[in-house]
UniProtKB/Swiss-Prot annotation:
This is Uncharacterized transcriptional regulatory protein YLR278C. Pfam families: Fungal_trans, Zn_clus. One of its GO terms (biological process) is positive regulation of transcription by RNA polymerase II. Residues 41-68 bind DNA. It is found in: Nucleus. Its main location: nucleus. Residues 72-93, 779-791, 864-906, 920-967, 1036-1050, 1078-1090 have a biased composition (Low complexity).
C-alpha cells in the first residue's frame, strides 16, 4: 500500500500566512538556509515535498494560496526544468487581446480551502472590462468564448494531460471556472456558489502585466483575521439573511460598469506595493496606526446606495454636533468620483490614455488623494454609526479606513493646515468609536488645537476674512471635541478661554453654500443646538479653569472650603443656562443630548466638593441626581442599540457611577457623625430606608449594565468595569454590615424652618419651586420627589430644561428619555415585533400577580404623550394630597428633639409640615410601644421616653453652625450657610436601636459582608497600585516619602482602622507593651476626639533609624503618594484631630491608595488587563485623573477601615470561624507558640518579661505585621492573628511614643504555611470555586 495522501490543515496554512505577514521583507529569516543549498520554496520545505520550481510561483503555493518564498538557487532549478517543458517563466506572460477579468478588491480568501465556502465578504465579483475603459462588446466576448471551447473540446484531454505539468493543468482549471462564471447570470444561486468557491491567485503572479487596465494586486499582503472586537460584525455578515442583499448589490454594480471607471482609476493610483508606501511621511504616522489598521484589505469598489447612505448618516447624526465639513463640497466630489468625472493632469503617472469625458473635472494628484481619503474617512465613521442599528450589511469599518489611510499616505507632506485639521478631526471621530486607548485621542486633539491656534489663529475673529465662516466652523468643532476629550481623560485644556474671541454661529456661518437654501429660515435647529452646546461648554470651561479641576499633576489640586462660593456662583450660571434654554426650538434627539451635556457639567462642578455638603444639601442632591441621569441615559442608549460605543462614554459612565458610590459613603459618614454626637456607642448606623437609597441603587444598576455592555463591545472598558465592580462589592458589603445588631438607627423627628429672605438672582416662579424643596431629608425623599415634581410643572410653561432632581421613575423613565436614541437608529417595525414577543412572554412566564408591574402598550403611548411635562399624574396627585395635609406639632413632642443640625438649604414650610406629620405619627406609635413595653426602654439605651429629661441633657447642638450672621463652612458637619440667601434650618433626630436587632441568619450575612469587603479591598488596592505605577515612574522618591513605602510584592503598612490615612504607619500598634498606652475607659472612649494620635508627633529621623531596612522599600508609586506634605494636608489633619475618630468624610488625598495588599497577591494573580496597563500608555493614567482618583482612594480607605475593624473584632472572627476553626487553632498550640516566640525574642535581645507583656498585648499582633526577616518577607496582619489571643485592638490610643527598642524580626516561615486555610477563605469565595470545579461550566474558566 502506498503512503496515504497528506492532508494539510487550514490552521497550518493560516499560521504560515501570519509568519509571512510578520516577516515582511525579511523572508530569509523563515528560510533559514544557512549553507545556501536549498532549492525548494518555503511551503514545500515545510511539507517535505518536491517543488516543481515554477515561476512566478510553484504549483503548491498557488493551490494553497500563499506567497511562494523562494531561496537564492530556486531560479537555477527553474532554468533546468524549463528546458524540458513549455511552461512560461517569470515575465513571459504575453499580452492577450481578449477582455481582461476585473475583480473587486474585497476580503481576500487566500487561505481558504478549495472545498470550504467563504463568506460574502470574501467573494470576488467578476465583471468583464476592456482595456480601453469602455463597455465590453458582447458579441466579441461570446465569439472568444466559443473559440476557447472549440479548442478545448476537440482535443483529447488524456493526450493533453500527458504533455502538461500540474502548473498548466491548474491554470486551465482556473480558466474553466472563470468561463463558467461568464456563462451564468449574476445573482443566481449557482453563480453565488461558484463565486464563493473561487480562490484568487492573481496576486501571486508577476508584476509585468502592463496590458491590464485594472491595478495590479501585488501590493496585497497576506492578512490576518480581524480583531476580536470586530468578530460580531463578521458573523453578522456571514448570516444567510445577508445573501440577498449582497447579490442585489452585486447585480447593481454589474449593471453599472460605466460608473466604475473612476474606481479603477483610484485603484491604479494605489498601484504601488504596500511595502513601498512611505508611511513615515503620512500625517497619521506619529499616532502608531500602521500596525493596527493597515493589516486589512482596502476597498475600491463603491456601491452607490450604501455610499450615499454613509454621507446622509454623517451629515444628519454628526454634522449638527461637529460641523467640520462642507456638505456641498463632499457631495460634489462624491458625485464626480462615482460617475467618473475626475480628470487627472497628464503629468500624473496614473493618467489613463483614454479620452476624458466632456463633463470631467480636473484634480491634481495630491488634491484627489486628499479628497478621496477624506471621503473614505467619512465612510468609515458612518459605518460605525450604522452598526448601532444592527441592520448594517456593508464591509467592516476598518476596511474603509484602510482605503482612506492609503490615499492620505499618498499625499505625504503636501497637505495644508486646513486639510490637516479636517483629516485629524475626522481621525478623532473615528478612533472614538474603535477599541483604542483614550490617550491617543488627547494627543491628536492637542496637535489639532496647536495648528488652529498657532498656525491659523482660528481663535481670533476676523470678519473681513472671506474664509471667516469656514474658520469659525473649524475652530468651534475642534473646541468642542477638545473640551470633551480633556474632561473625559482628565487632562488640562490646550487653550484657555481668555484666548478665544469668536462669536457664536448664525445661519450664514453654520450652513455651507447651497445647503442653506433648502433649510428653513426661522427656528433653525442646527444653529440652536450648536450655540447652546457652545454656551454650556464655555461655562464649564470657566469653572474648570477657575477652580483648577484639571491639572497636569492631579495631586496639586486643592479643593477647599473657601471655593464654595465660587461653586455656588457657577452652579447659578448653569441654572441660568438651563432655564433660558428652550426645548421647543430643537428636535427631541438634540434636546436629550443637551440634557446629557448639562448633567455632565453639573457632576463635574460639584463632585470635587461633595464632602463639604450635607446629603440634604441642594448641590449634593443635584450632583447625585445628575450622575444617576447620566447612567440612565446611557443605559437607554445601549438598550436600543445593538453595536457601537465611544471611549469618552466609558469614562463618563464610570465616573458617574463612582460618584454615586461616593455619595453613599459620604452619607454614611455623615450619619455616623450625627449618631455619635448623640452619645450613641453603637458600632454602625443603620442605612436609612428611603426613596433616595433605592433610587441610587437603581442608578448603580444602570451603570453596571452600561459598563458590562461596553466591555462586550470594547475591550478598553474592561478595566473600568472590573474596578467599578469591586467598588460595588465594597459598598454592598458595608451596607450589609451596617444592618447588624450592633447598629443604631437615626430617626428624623422634625425641622423648624426659620423665615428667610428671598434669594437673589431668582426671578421666576420655577426657581422658587425648585429651591423650596432643598431641605428634604432622605428619609422623606418620597415627599420631596412629589413636591419637586408638582412644583416643576411651572418649568414646562417657559420651555426650560428640567433640573437633574426632577426625575421620572418606573414605567415612564424609559419613555421619558426615549429621544436620546435617534429614530434612525431604531427600527420601528422590529420594535413592534419585539413588543408582541414581549406580550407573549408576559402571558406565558410572568405570574398574573406581577403582570401589572410591566408597562403595557397603552401606558407607553400615554406616557410618551405626556413626556413634555416633567411629572406623571400619579406624582402630581400624591404631591397635592400631601401638600394639603397640615398638622400642628404638639409641644410635648418638641421636648424629644435630640439634635439640631444646620442645613444650607432653602426650606419649605409645606415639606417640613409633611415631615412633622409623618414623624409625629411614627413618634406616637413609638411612645405607645414604649409605654406598653417597659423592657424595650431598659434594653435600648438610645431609645429614650418623651418625658425623660435626661435625654434632653444628652442632646447636643453644634454651636458653630448656628452663626447665622456670617457665612460659615464647618467641615465636620458638611454644613454651609449663606447670609444673603438662606437662614439656618434645624433638623432634629433621635437615635433608636432597631426592634429586630437579632436576626436568625445574621452570622451568615456578617460573614458575607466581611469577606466581600475584604476581597474588594484587596482587588481595589491591586488595581490602584498597578494601574498607577506608570504615572509615578518618572518621580524620584524623596527622603520623607521613603518612610511609609513598602514593596509592591509584600504587605505595605496599613492605614489606621478608624482614623484618616496618615503618611506614617500606625506606630501605636507597632511597639512593645511598655510604650503603648492602656485601653481607654468607656467614659473616655465616648469622646475619642481628644485622643487621636497626630501623625506629626513622630520624628522622621527616629522612625527611619529604628525600622528594619527590609521592612520598607522605595516604591515610586507610594513614594509619590506619601510625600505630598502640603499645607492642605496639615490643615486637614488639624481639623480631624479636633473631631471624631470615626471614618472621615474625606480621606486625605495626599496619603492614599495603598493601605494593605495581601502577600499572596503577587504579579501572577494580577489580571491580564492590569498587566497590560503597566506597559506603555494605558488606561491607568486616565482612570484616576478624571475625577475618580480621589473618590476611589477614599472608598478604598474606608473599606480598609472596616476590614481592619473586623480583623480585630473577636465577635466577628468567632462568627466567621467556628470554635474548631479559629485562627489560633489553625496554627499551633499555645506552648509551641510561646516557645517559638521566646526564641525569636531572645535572638533579638528582648527580655522574657517584655516578651510576656507583648504577647498578651493586642498591639503585638500589629507588631508581627510590621516584622520582616532578612530576606524582606513581610507578613500580613491576618497571618499573625493566630499567634495570640483575639483581643480587641483599640484604635484610639494616646501616648508619647518612643522608639527605644528595635522591632524583632520573624525568621520562621511555618506561620504562613499553617495559615493557608485562613488565606484561602480571605482571598476567594465559594462562587469562584464553583466556576472552577464544576465540569459543566468548565468552558467559562
Amino acid at each position: 500500500m502506498g503512503r496515504p495522501r497528506k492532508n494539510v490543515s487550514q490552521e497550518k496554512i493560516q499560521q504560515l500566512k501570519r509568519e509571512l505577514e510578520l516577516a515582511g521583507n525579511r523572508t530569509d529569516v523563515l528560510l533559514q538556509d544557512k549553507k545556501g543549498r536549498s532549492r525548494s520554496c518555503l511551503l514545500c520545505r515545510r511539507r517535505k515535498q518536491r517543488c516543481d520550481h515554477k515561476l512566478p510561483s510553484c504549483t503548491a503555493c498557488l493551490k494553497a494560496g500563499i506567497k511562494c518564498v523562494q531561496p537564492s538557487k530556486y531560479s537555477s532549478s527553474t532554468s533546468n526544468s524549463n528546458t524540458n517543458n513549455n511552461t512560461p517563466t517569470a515575465g513571459t506572460v504575453p499580452p492577450t487581446p481578449h477582455p481582461v477579468i476585473k475583480r473587486e478588491l474585497q476580503d481576500s480568501s487566500i487561505g481558504a480551502g478549495a472545498g470550504a465556502a467563504t463568506s460574502l465578504n470574501d467573494m470576488t465579483i467578476i465583471k468583464p472590462i476592456s482595456t480601453s475603459n469602455s463597455n465590453v462588446d458582447a458579441g466579441d466576448a461570446n465569439e472568444f468564448r466559443k473559440t476557447i471551447k472549440s479548442v478545448t473540446t476537440n482535443s483529447n484531454p488524456n493526450l493533453m494531460r500527458q504533455d502538461k505539468d500540474q502548473y498548466t493543468i491548474f491554470l486551465e482549471k482556473k480558466l474553466k471556472s472563470l468561463e463558467t462564471l461568464l456563462d451564468l447570470s449574476p445573482g443566481c444561486n449557482q453563480y453565488n456558489y461558484e463565486l464563493s468557491q473561487y480562490k484568487k491567485v492573481s496576486h501571486l503572479f508577476s508584476n509585468n502585466t502592463s496590458d491590464y487596465s485594472r491595478p495590479n494586486s501585488s501590493n496585497m499582503v497576506i492578512l490576518p483575521l480581524p480583531s476580536p472586537s470586530n468578530k460580531p460584525l463578521e458573523n453578522t455578515n456571514n448570516n444567510g439573511s445577508n445573501v440577498n442583499a449582497a447579490t442585489n448589490d452585486t447585480s447593481a454594480s454589474t449593471n453599472n460598469i460605466n460608473n466604475n471607471n473612476a474606481i479603477c482609476q483610484s485603484a491604479s493610483l494605489l498601484n504601488d506595493p504596500l511595502e513601498t508606501l512611505d508611511f513615515t511621511k503620512c500625517i497619521f504616522a506619529k499616532y502608531n496606526l500602521k500596525k493596527e489598521f493597515l493589516m486589512y484589505d482596502p476597498i475600491f469598489e463603491l456601491n452607490e446606495k450604501l455610499s450615499r447612505s454613509f454621507l446622509d448618516t454623517f451629515f444628519t447624526r454628526l454634522q449638527f454636533k461637529y460641523p467640520i465639513l462642507d456638505e456641498q463640497e463632499i457631495y460634489t466630489f462624491y458625485d464626480h468620483y462615482l460617475h467618473n468625472k475626475i480628470l487627472i493632469p497628464p503629468s500624473s503617472p496614473a493618467t489613463s490614455s483614454a479620452a476624458p469625458p466632456s463633463n470631467s473635472h480636473s484634480y491634481s494628484e495630491i488634491e484627489f488623494h486628499f479628497l478621496s481619503g477624506r471621503m473614505w474617512l467619512v465612510f468609515s465613521i458612518s459605518a460605525y454609526l450604522l452598526m448601532t442599528t444592527g441592520k448594517y450589511k456593508g464591509f467592516p469599518p476598518h476596511r474603509y479606513f484602510s482605503t482612506a489611510i492609503r490615499h492620505i499616505t499618498k499625499c505625504g507632506l503636501h497637505l495644508n493646515y486646513v486639510q490637516q485639521i479636517e483629516l485629524l478631526t475626522l481621525l478623532v471621530l473615528y478612533i472614538i468609536r474603535t477599541d483604542r486607548d483614550s490617550l491617543i485621542l488627547y494627543d491628536i486633539i492637542k496637535d489639532v488645537m496647536g495648528i488652529s491656534k498657532k498656525k491659523l489663529h482660528l481663535n481670533q475673529w476676523y470678519p473681513n476674512d472671506p474664509f471667516a465662516n469656514k474658520k469659525l466652523r473649524l475652530f468651534w468643532c475642534v473646541y468642542l471635541l477638545e473640551r470633551m476629550i480633556c474632561v473625559a481623560v482628565g487632562k488640562p485644556y490646550t487653550i484657555k478661554e481668555s484666548e478665544i474671541n469668536l462669536p457664536l454661529f448664525n445661519n450664514d456661518s453654520f450652513y455651507t453654500k447651497g445647503v442653506h437654501a433648502a433649510a428653513p429660515s426661522t427656528n433653525d435647529h442646527g444653529v440652536q443646538f450648536i450655540n447652546q452646546s457652545l454656551k454650556l461648554r464655555r461655562i464649564e470651561s470657566q469653572f474648570v479653569e477657575t477652580l483648577q479641576l484639571l491639572k497636569n499633576d492631579s495631586r496639586s489640586v486643592k479643593q477647599s472650603i473657601d471655593q464654595l462660593p465660587l461653586v455656588r456662583k457657577f452652579f447659578e450660571d448653569l441654572e441660568v443656562w438651563r432655564k433660558s434654554y428652550s426645548t421647543l426650538d430643537v428636535k427631541n434627539f438634540e434636546n436629550e443630548t443637551l440634557k446629557l451635556y448639562y448633567y455632565r457639567s453639573v457632576r463635574l462642578l460639584i463632585q470635587p466638593y461633595l464632602e463639604f455638603f450635607a446629603p440634604e444639601d441642594r448641590l449634593f442632591r443635584e450632583c447625585q441626581a445628575a450622575a444617576g441621569q447620566i447612567c440612565q441615559l446611557y443605559k437607554i442608549f445601549h438598550q436600543k442599540t445593538l453595536n457601537g460605543h465611544s471611549t469618552p462614554a466609558v469614562h463618563t459612565v464610570f465616573v458617574a457611577g463612582v460618584t454615586l458610590i461616593y455619595c453613599m459613603w459620604l452619607a454614611r459618614n455623615f450619619d455616623d457623625q450625627r449618631r455619635k454626637k448623640l452619645g450613641d456607642a453603637s458600632k454602625h448606623t443603620r442605612p436609612l430606608i428611603s426613596a433616595s437609597l433605592f433610587s441610587t441603587m437603581d442608578d448603580l444598576r444602570a451603570c453596571s449594565v452600561c459598563l458590562y455592555v461596553m466591555t462586550e463591545r470594547s475591550n478598553f472598558a474592561r478595566t473600568f468595569r472590573d474596578t467599578f465592580d469591586q467598588l460595588m462589592n465594597a459598598t454592598v458589603g458595608n451596607l450589609i454590615e451596617r444592618c447588624g445588631p450592633d447598629s443604631s438607627e437615626l430617626i428624623f423627628m422634625a425641622s423648624s424652618v426659620a423665615k428667610r429672605t428671598e434669594p437673589k438672582n431668582i426671578n421666576d416662579e420655577a426657581n422658587k419651586a425648585i429651591s423650596s424643596g432643598d431641605t428634604l431629608h432622605d428619609s422623606n425623599s418620597a415627599n420631596a420627589a412629589n413636591l419637586s415634581n408638582s412644583n416643576d410643572k411651572n418649568i414646562s410653561h417657559n420651555g426650560g430644561m428640567p433640573p437633574a432632581v426632577a426625575r421620572i421613575f418606573g414605567k415612564g423613565q424609559a419613555e421619558e428619555h426615549a429621544g436620546f436614541v435617534e429614530n434612525s437608529q431604531v427600527d420601528l417595525a422590529e420594535q413592534e415585533k419585539f413588543k408582541k414577543k414581549q406580550g407573549v412572554l408576559e402571558k406565558t412566564s410572568v405570574p398574573k400577580s406581577l403582570a401589572h408591574l410591566l408597562t403595557k402598550m397603552d401606558d407607553r403611548s400615554r406616557i410618551s404623550n405626556s413626556s413634555m411635562s416633567y411629572t406623571t399624574s400619579s406624582s402630581s396627585s400624591s404631591s397635592s394630597s400631601s401638600s394639603s395635609s397640615t398638622l400642628s406639632f404638639p409641644s410635648s413632642q418638641e421636648k424629644n428633639l435630640k439634635i439640631n443640625v444646620n442645613n444650607d438649604n432653602n426650606g419649605m414650610t409645606i415639606s417640613s409640615v409633611n415631615r412633622e406629620h409623618n414623624n409625629n405619627h411614627n413618634n406616637n406609635n413609638d411612645n405607645n410601644n414604649n409605654n406598653n413595653n417597659n423592657n424595650n426602654n431598659s434594653n435600648n439605651n438610645n431609645n429614650v421616653n418623651n418625658n425623660d429629661n435626661e435625654s434632653n441633657s444628652r442632646s447636643t447642638t453644634n454651636n458653630s453652625c448656628n452663626n447665622g450672621n456670617n457665612s460659615q463652612y464647618v467641615r465636620n458637619n458638611n454644613v454651609t450657610m449663606e447670609n444673603d440667601v438662606e437662614r439656618p434650618i434645624q433638623d432634629q433626630y433621635i437615635v433608636k436601636k432597631p426592634t429586630n436587632q437579632t436576626e436568625f441568619d445574621w452570622q451568615v450575612f456578617q460573614q458575607q459582608a466581611f469577606l466581600q469587603q475584604q476581597l474588594a479591598q484587596h482587588n481595589l488596592q491591586a488595581y490602584l497600585s498597578s494601574l498607577n505605577t506608570d504615572t509615578m515612574t518618572n518621580r524620584s522618591p524623596s527622603k520623607s516619602s521613603s518612610i511609609s513605602t513598602a514593596s509592591s510584592h509584600s504587605d505595605p503598612i496599613p492605614i489606621a482602622m478608624t482614623q484618616s490615612p496618615t503618611p506614617y504607619p500606625q506606630t501605636s500598634n507597632m511597639l512593645p507593651q511598655q510604650h503603648v498606652s492602656r485601653p481607654l475607659p468607656q467614659q473616655q472612649r465616648e469622646q475619642p476626639q481628644q485622643h487621636i494620635t497626630s501623625p506629626q508627633r513622630f520624628s522622621e529621623s527616629n522612625f527611619t533609624n529604628q525600622l528594619n531596612n527590609g521592612m520598607i522599600n522605595s516604591n515610586p508609586l507610594q513614594s509619590a503618594i506619601f510625600s505630598n506634605h502640603t499645607s492642605e494636608n496639615k490643615q486637614l489633619r488639624d481639623v480631624e484631630e479636633s473631631n471624631f475618630s470615626t471614618s472621615p468624610l474625606r480621606a486625605d488625598y495626599g496619603n492614599n491608595i495603598i493601605s494593605s495588599i495581601p502577600a499572596s497577591f503577587t504579579s501572577n494573580s494580577i489580571p491580564v488587563s492590569v498587566k497590560q496597563a503597566r506597559n506603555g500608555s494605558s488606561s491607568g493614567d486616565i482612570l484616576f485623573s478624571n475625577g475618580a482618583h480621589d473618590m476611589i482612594n477614599n472608598i478604598s480607605t474606608w473599606t480598609n477601615n472596616s476590614v481592619l475593624d473586623a480583623l480585630n473584632s473577636k465577635s466577628i472572627l468567632q462568627t466567621i470561624f467556628p470554635q474548631s476553626q479559629e485562627p489560633s487553632s489553625l496554627s499551633m498550640d499555645k506552648q509551641q507558640q510561646q516557645h517559638q516566640q521566646q526564641n525569636m525574642c531572645s535572638e533579638n535581645n528582648v527580655t522574657a518579661n517584655n516578651f510576656q507583656q507583648t504577647q498578651n498585648d493586642p498591639s503585638y499582633n500589629r507588631n508581627l505585621f510590621m516584622m520582616s526577616n532578612q530576606e524582606g518577607v513581610q507578613y500580613n496582619l491576618d497571618e499573625t492573628e493566630k499567634n495570640g489571643p483575639k483581643t480587641q485592638v483599640e484604635a484610639n490610643t494616646s501616648a508619647n511614643l518612643h522608639f527605644d527598642n528595635v522591632i524583632p524580626t520573624v525568621t520562621n516561615a511555618d506561620i504562613r504555611k499553617k495559615r493557608s486555610n485562613w488565606d484561602n477563605m480571605m482571598t476567594s469565595g465559594p462562587v469562584e470555586d464553583f466556576w472552577t470545579i464544576n465540569d459543566d461550566y468548565g468552558f467559562l474558566t
